[in-house]
């Protein structure tokens, strides 16, 4: 299905990662496959908000018994799970997870990010400023692309 197929997220480094949507057990990879996963809330049709980023050496078993999925579903309104697999090396999984957490700033990863630091607050403020800048949306809506000063 096109609507629940693949989505690309960008980490703090600017690197893009292409994730696959997982809606049921049958679409999950085989047991023993490592990777990265994201809990997501779908706002409107194509506006996805990442809520939690994690890594696992066995992504199937981790997602089927994840302790934070209930909280993500009931309190944050999570609707989907996206996975990036296979990533065999633990060091690569750790590096990608950290890059995505710093770039996406998901609310359920706040304790792991150290969001109380002034640098994190400044990054979040800059992100919100870009998000609410109407001129940056003109390119998406068919108008002229915004000029940055």
Task: Report each predicted region and the residues it spans.
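Boundary/linker segments flanking structured domains
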Residues: 1-51, 55-149
């Amino acid at each position: 299905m096109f609507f629940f197929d693949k989505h690309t997220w960008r980490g703090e480094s600017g690197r893009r990662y292409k994730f696959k949507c997982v809606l049921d057990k049958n679409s999950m990879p085989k047991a023993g496959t490592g990777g990265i996963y994201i809990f997501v809330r779908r706002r409107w049709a194509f506006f996805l908000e990442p809520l939690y980023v994690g890594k696992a050496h066995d992504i199937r078993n981790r997602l089927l018994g994840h302790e934070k999925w209930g909280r993500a579903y009931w309190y944050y309104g999570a609707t989907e799970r996206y996975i990036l697999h296979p990533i065999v090396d633990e060091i690569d999984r750790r590096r990608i997870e950290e890059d995505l957490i710093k770039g996406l700033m998901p609310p359920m990863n706040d304790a792991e990010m150290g969001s109380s630091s002034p640098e994190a607050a400044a990054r979040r403020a800059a992100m919100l400023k870009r998000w609410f800048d109407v001129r940056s949306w003109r390119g998406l809506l068919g108008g002229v692309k915004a000029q940055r000063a």
